[in-house]
UniProtKB/Swiss-Prot annotation:
<feature type="binding site">
    <location>
        <position position="96"/>
    </location>
    <ligand>
        <name>substrate</name>
    </ligand>
</feature>
<comment type="similarity">
    <text>Belongs to the eIF-2B alpha/beta/delta subunits family. MtnA subfamily.</text>
</comment>
<dbReference type="InterPro" id="IPR027363">
    <property type="entry name" value="M1Pi_N"/>
</dbReference>
<dbReference type="GO" id="GO:0046523">
    <property type="term" value="F:S-methyl-5-thioribose-1-phosphate isomerase activity"/>
</dbReference>
<keyword id="KW-0486">Methionine biosynthesis</keyword>
<feature type="binding site">
    <location>
        <begin position="256"/>
        <end position="257"/>
    </location>
    <ligand>
        <name>substrate</name>
    </ligand>
</feature>
<keyword id="KW-0413">Isomerase</keyword>
<feature type="binding site">
    <location>
        <position position="205"/>
    </location>
    <ligand>
        <name>substrate</name>
    </ligand>
</feature>
<feature type="binding site">
    <location>
        <begin position="54"/>
        <end position="56"/>
    </location>
    <ligand>
        <name>substrate</name>
    </ligand>
</feature>
<feature type="active site" description="Proton donor">
    <location>
        <position position="246"/>
    </location>
</feature>
<dbReference type="Pfam" id="PF01008">
    <property type="entry name" value="IF-2B"/>
</dbReference>
<protein>
    <recommendedName>
        <fullName>Methylthioribose-1-phosphate isomerase</fullName>
        <ecNumber>5.3.1.23</ecNumber>
    </recommendedName>
</protein>
<dbReference type="GO" id="GO:0019509">
    <property type="term" value="P:L-methionine salvage from methylthioadenosine"/>
</dbReference>
<comment type="pathway">
    <text>Amino-acid biosynthesis; L-methionine biosynthesis via salvage pathway; L-methionine from S-methyl-5-thio-alpha-D-ribose 1-phosphate: step 1/6.</text>
</comment>
<dbReference type="InterPro" id="IPR037171">
    <property type="entry name" value="NagB/RpiA_transferase-like"/>
</dbReference>
<keyword id="KW-0028">Amino-acid biosynthesis</keyword>
<comment type="function">
    <text>Catalyzes the interconversion of methylthioribose-1-phosphate (MTR-1-P) into methylthioribulose-1-phosphate (MTRu-1-P).</text>
</comment>
Length: 358
């Protein structure tokens, strides 16, 4: 299965080449494929903040490489690079406050600096750590894809119609994707007949990005208005909703793209199973419940301009980027460490704190 998954991979969003970070500008997709070359930390932070790169895992990976660029700058300046680098940690951390993977990646990079041996080259060590973060995310996605599709097969063995929301594919990660990784694996195994994708306003990650990814691989995909998704569950024989996560609290509450919560409510009402696919790095045991997850809000301009035409001048806008889906609406969380059905605090703590022999 792993070899087939790798052979099917066609999309990548992050490249580290020649000492620079190259990001596929996702604001322009699908009409234009343009790569941004970032050679300093300010450019990386701007790319994260302005959503040229997005998706929790991809943000964390980009931030790790951003710290490598920051360190290179600080060393060239010749001052107290350890103290100066703290400003760069803060700059990156503030770029997107909801993504748990961002803070996980920054903390892992900080820990690597703290563990440096006197004889080590600090820049080479930090670069190697960023590459390791990138590689491990891709491997985690491959593992989750296989686990997720086996779970779907266990519940129902024939080809099915799945619903996804937002974009949790290769564009949102180090490669292959989380939710879309499961869907890709399912299609290769003959378990997925059709994928329905919600448009995901206001940035249209579903119609612009998920639709583009799946169509590129020949996977049958139908785009739907966000307002049609409950009707879709009622009429189209959907068996699973499969989504990614930006942050998972200790009790299993999950922050996802705005609209995910109402999707979970509809799924519960219609008897459709709800699967969250996310690496264990998205779980933050320091956040007791979803109420503790900081939820980003963005500028009103994202709603007040439609194709260059002003919309309702003078109105106020509520523009949250994420909402919280309570754990009791989630049937299963799939991670690279294992599957948690009917998630709660005890199960997630056991998953995250489980000791490994290798």
């Amino acid at each position: 299965m792993r070899e087939r998954l790798l052979a099917a991979e066609k999309v990548t969003a992050i490249r580290w080449q020649g000492g620079a970070l190259h990001l596929l500008d996702q604001r322009l997709l699908p009409s234009e494929e343009r790569w941004l070359a970032c050679d300093n930390v300010a450019q990386v932070a701007a790319a994260i903040r302005d959503m040229a790169v997005r998706g929790a895992s991809a943000i964390g990976i980009a931030a790790a490489y951003g710290l490598v660029l920051a360190l290179e700058e600080r060393l060239a300046e010749g001052g107290d690079w350890e103290m100066d680098l703290e400003d760069d940690f803060l700059t990156l951390a503030e770029a997107r406050p909801t993504a748990a993977n961002l803070f996980w990646a920054l903390n892992r990079m900080r820990e690597r600096l703290l563990c440096l041996r006197p004889e080590e080259d600090v820049l080479a060590a930090l670069e190697a750590e960023a590459v390791a973060i990138h590689d491990s995310d891709r491997e985690a996605n491959l593992t989750m894809a296989q686990q997720g599709i086996e779970l779907i097969r266990r519940h129902q063995g024939n080809a099915q119609a799945l619903l996804t929301f937002g974009n949790a594919g290769a564009l949102a990660s180090g490669g292959f994707g989380t939710a879309l990784g499961v869907i890709r694996a399912g299609y290769l195994e003959g378990m997925v007949e059709r994928v329905y994708a919600g448009e995901t306003r206001p940035w249209l990650q579903g119609s612009r990005l998920t639709g583009w990814e799946l169509a590129n691989e020949g996977i049958p995909v139908t785009l739907c208005a966000d307002s049609a998704l409950a009707h879709l569950m009622k009429t189209k024989g959907i068996t699973w909703v499969v989504v990614g996560a930006d942050c998972i609290a200790a009790n299993g509450d999950m922050a996802g793209k705005i609209g995910t919560y109402q999707l979970a409510v509809s799924a519960m009402h219609h008897g459709v199973r709800f699967m969250v696919v996310a690496p264990s790095t998205s779980i933050d045991l320091n956040l007791a419940t979803g109420e503790d997850i900081p939820l980003e809000e963005r500028d009103a301009d994202e709603w007040l301009d439609f194709g260059g035409t002003p919309v309702s001048p003078g109105v106020e806008v509520f523009n949250p980027v994420f909402d919280v889906t309570p754990a009791d609406l989630i049937d299963v969380i799939v991670t690279e460490r294992g599957i948690v059905e009917r998630p709660d605090a005890a199960k997630l703590a056991q998953l995250v704190c489980r000791k490994r022999l290798h």
